[in-house]
Amino acid sequence: MNSIEKDSYFCSKVSQLRQEVNRDAIEHILLEILDYVITHYALKFPNGTLRLLELEIYYRGANYAGESTHGDELQTNRCGKLYDHRKGGTRKGFDVVLSQGKDYYLSCLVKGTVCEDEVLFKQGMSYDKCQAFAGVENLSEYKPIALAPLDEPTIGPVLHSKRIGLTNESDKDAILRSLNCSYLEPQSKDFNLLYKYKGYQKTEFFKAEMKLRRVNPQQATDLSKLLLGYVEKASIAEFFNQAGSQD
């Protein structure tokens, strides 16, 4: 596979994204890009690799306001490179930049990674490991392209939900967060630890997946058993009540 900036599928999706004007369609394309990156790429350094467990995607362009995007020029025209969130503060976080031009912002916030057999749940844990591999204090100063193709794409399911902690009214309900279950089974101990740390519920993934998959009642029941280990009747009823009111 080619590097990300020469990946024909990725480039075609970004081109499609830039030309679309419908907000729902734009967010659908963003989710396609996000899922492609999380299943086909990793962060590779001379002395180690971070596989992508959990990502959120952010975009701002002429066709999409994307108010929750930082809007830093380092999030533009640096496809495959890293963007460090810190500007003298203590909050740790970094993006993988996907923008190939100076007139739009496109990047993925790295929420979780896997290093060898260690699951790095906390955003800061992934930051520290990435910083150690990159050998720089500020990840924006790491010059090589860090995003590199996997030898083989992952084949496990990818789950989705809303991005975490957003308050902007136009951004907060968009389903633009992905979790790669090739590295983390839904019923595993590690999966439950993820939720214990982050303080949100597995039902958020379940609700988003019902919406994205447009499930019927039986499919909703089966999906609930798969993701939650039980039938989440309240969420299923709420989903179909809302669907009925929109018909």
Specify the residue positions occupied by each region the protein language model found.
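A cross-family signal for N-terminal binding/gating loops and helix N-caps
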Residues: 1-247
